[in-house]
Amino acid sequence: MLIIRNKQALKEAILKETQVNKTIGFVPTMGFLHEGHMTLVKHARKENDVVVMSVFVNPTQFGPNEDFDAYPRDEAHDAKLAEEGGVDILFVPSVEEIYPVELATKLHVIKRVSVLDGADREGHFDGVVTVLTKLFHLVNPNNAYFGQKDAQQVAVVSGLVEDYFFPVNLRIISTVRETDGLAKSSRNVYLTDKERKEAPVIHAALQLGRQLIESGETDETKIVQMMTDKINEQTAHEKIAYLALYAYPDFTPVTDWSKGIIIAAAVKYSKARLIDNELINVKRR
């Protein structure tokens, strides 16, 4: 496995592969890898000749009240997992490598971000599309891999790819979970033992919402209240940041219950904010 920190070296390494018609699969991450990331790598390995992974904690997607410096990092651990998983090129740039000068232009997301994380974390998705635009240009992948757990991000990135004609196929992979249903996340390490035992109720509540909708329930207030009650009864969280359902991928109010719907939750614990979702009537790519 090649570990590359320099943009030019990355482009040269990838050009060497594409000149002999090899396909490139790309897994962008912020590091502190876990089984969820490695599932993306597994799919990329199966579907491409060359697998490129980036590990970059992107400062532009952190808000003023979010601690960029405290985000967990472990490069040695990440490199070990990446190599064991079959990554060919690991791109680990510095902030200065990706943002060498102050940006003269800025991407701004105007749709699919007025609710959920888009509303809760102002400017977050602007940072996401900015760094992905840079990375897509550097890697020029045939396929890029994202997890369903970040469903709003997936919808935003799909819009980016469609709007700016990026020649990349987005591959969306189902959320990887612990045996008790908790979605795998780098932030799970911040949960106390008690919080960790209780946190799987988030997924259980979302499944309840799915069951209600699939059984014909269309009273949105009732669905959300039943899910809220389930979470409040079974876990001592700090607050529910959001628990809602929307049409997917547009994140507008549901008007047709036979089309794509997302039920999404964000629950704040003492030192961790966990997100999860269920997609209904959505065909995965």
Curated annotation (Swiss-Prot):
Entries under InterPro entries matching the protein: Cyt_trans-like, Pantoate_ligase, Pantoate_ligase_C, Rossmann-like_a/b/a_fold
Residues annotated as binding ATP: 30-37, 147-150, 176, 184-187
Catalytic reactions of this protein: (R)-pantoate + beta-alanine + ATP = (R)-pantothenate + AMP + diphosphate + H(+)
Pathway membership, UniProt: Cofactor biosynthesis; (R)-pantothenate biosynthesis; (R)-pantothenate from (R)-pantoate and beta-alanine: step 1/1
Active-site positions on this chain: 37
Localization annotation: Cytoplasm
Highest taxon in the source lineage: Bacteria
GO terms for cellular component: cytosol
Enzyme class: ligase
Enzyme Commission code(s) on record: 6.3.2.1
Record: residues binding (R)-pantoate: 61, 153
Residues where beta-alanine binds: 61
Signal peptide feature range: none
Keywords: ATP-binding, Cytoplasm, Ligase, Nucleotide-binding, Pantothenate biosynthesis
Keyword Nucleotide-binding (UniProt): yes
GO molecular function terms noted in the UniProt entry: ATP binding; pantoate-beta-alanine ligase activity
Keyword set includes Cytoplasm: yes
A Pfam family this chain is assigned to: Pantoate_ligase
GO terms, biological process: pantothenate biosynthetic process
Further facts: The reaction proceeds by a bi uni uni bi ping pong mechanism.
Subunit relationships: Homodimer.
Job description of the protein: Catalyzes the condensation of pantoate with beta-alanine in an ATP-dependent reaction via a pantoyl-adenylate intermediate.
Family per similarity comment: Belongs to the pantothenate synthetase family.
Protein name: Pantothenate synthetase
Gene assigned in the entry: panC
